[in-house]
């Protein structure tokens, strides 16, 4: 493997990068699916965190904390409730991972041709990460919306299957229904992925030489730190995205039945701050960070190992 921060930029063929990215997304998603469902349930709660009296207006369960939410879901919906939305999520993560790493590799190779006016390494990684994240997010967004809607279903099923959900949304909401909240998603993911890859590329050379690191390498540790830092900065947009994704004719049918009607990113932020306080923008942040650490570590570790395996297999042929 090449040294330093260039390893993600110039190693492997396009096919190897696509396959490795897809495998990384698939493995990571399955491992953290329960935490993702918990996060979505917490993000969709609308009662005030500072006013206990507001709990009386809640229609649906009240979730408090990661473990408590898991127990409630298992008790009311069974263990499979923790994997609701996993099919569209797996499809999304496989496609997202493949597109993300391919776009990142392609963008960095294009930027490398700008000599003698090449960007500084950190800025180059930021731009490449932002482009990769934006393209992958927009391309896979309908699957992200389906994942959220399935995860938000309680004991009463709104959508009976993946195909049925596609037909229902297309019929009742039109093509635009699949892209509710997309602007918040791109607005979130571009700085997130830019910061993630810039931090990852900066930390990996430093951590790669250290022993006894998680998962046996500096790749995973660098992925954890980069993800936690980037995730915290853009979390309010992630929450807004989830609130917008469940808008439409089925808004009052999810496990939280009194989700308000939101229109647009900025008006949603303003309404949440007005009714739930600034803390309302950070519902689910704890579980999101808990999820981000293993998810990013597993993703980067699996990607690196898959790519190495594919490269070694090609050499052995």
Curated annotation (Swiss-Prot):
- Whether Transport counts among this entry's keywords is yes
Q: Solcar repeats at which positions?
A: 12-110, 120-206, 214-309
Fetch the Pfam families from UniProt: Mito_carr
- Keywords of this protein's UniProt record, alphabetized? Membrane, Mitochondrion, Mitochondrion inner membrane, Repeat, Transmembrane, Transmembrane helix, Transport
InterPro entries linked to this entry: Mit_carrier, Mitochondrial_Carrier, Mitochondrial_sb/sol_carrier, Mt_carrier_dom_sf
Where is the major localization of this protein? mitochondrion
Membrane spanning stretches: 17-35, 91-107, 126-146, 184-200, 221-237, 284-301
List, alphabetically, the GO terms of the cellular component aspect. mitochondrial inner membrane
- Signal peptide residue numbers: none
PANTHER family this protein is in? MITOCHONDRIAL BASIC AMINO ACIDS TRANSPORTER-RELATED, SLC (SOLUTE CARRIER) HOMOLOG
The family note in this entry says: Belongs to the mitochondrial carrier (TC 2.A.29) family.
Tell me, what does this protein do in biology?
Mitochondrial transporter that mediates uptake of thiamine pyrophosphate (ThPP) into mitochondria.
- Name under which the protein is recorded: Mitochondrial thiamine pyrophosphate carrier 1
Annotated organism of origin = Aspergillus fumigatus (strain ATCC MYA-4609 / CBS 101355 / FGSC A1100 / Af293) (Neosartorya fumigata)
């Amino acid at each position: 493997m090449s040294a330093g921060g260039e390893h993600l930029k110039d190693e492997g063929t396009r096919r190897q990068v696509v396959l490795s990215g897809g495998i990384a997304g698939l493995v990571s998603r399955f491992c953290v699916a329960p935490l993702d469902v918990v996060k979505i349930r917490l993000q969709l709660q609308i009662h005030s965190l500072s006013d206990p009296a507001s709990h009386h207006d809640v229609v649906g369960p009240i979730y408090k904390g990661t473990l408590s939410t898991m127990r409630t879901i298992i008790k009311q919906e069974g263990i499979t409730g923790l994997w609701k939305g996993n099919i569209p999520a797996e499809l999304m993560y496989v496609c997202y991972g493949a597109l993300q790493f391919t776009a990142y590799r392609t963008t960095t190779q294009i930027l490398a041709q700008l000599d003698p006016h090449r960007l500084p390494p950190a800025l180059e990684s930021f731009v490449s990460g932002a482009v990769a994240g934006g393209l992958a997010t927009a391309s896979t967004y309908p699957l992200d919306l389906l994942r959220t809607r399935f995860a938000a279903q309680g004991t009463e099923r709104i959508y009976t299957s993946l195909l049925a959900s596609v037909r229902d949304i297309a019929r009742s909401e039109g093509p635009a229904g699949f892209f509710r909240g997309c602007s918040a998603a791109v607005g979130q993911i571009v700085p997130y992925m830019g910061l993630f890859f810039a931090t990852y590329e900066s930390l990996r050379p430093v951590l790669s030489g250290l022993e006894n690191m998680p998962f046996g390498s500096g790749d995973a540790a660098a992925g954890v730190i980069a993800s936690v830092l980037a995730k915290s900065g853009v979390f309010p947009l992630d929450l807004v995205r989830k609130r917008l994704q469940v808008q439409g004719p089925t808004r009052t049918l999810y496990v939280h039945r009194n989700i308000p009607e939101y229109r647009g990113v900025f008006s949603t932020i303003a309404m949440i701050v007005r009714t739930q306080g600034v803390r309302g923008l950070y519902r689910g942040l704890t579980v999101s960070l808990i999820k981000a650490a293993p998810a990013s570590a597993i993703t980067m570790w699996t990607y690196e190992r898959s790519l190495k395996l594919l490269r070694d297999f090609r050499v052995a042929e």
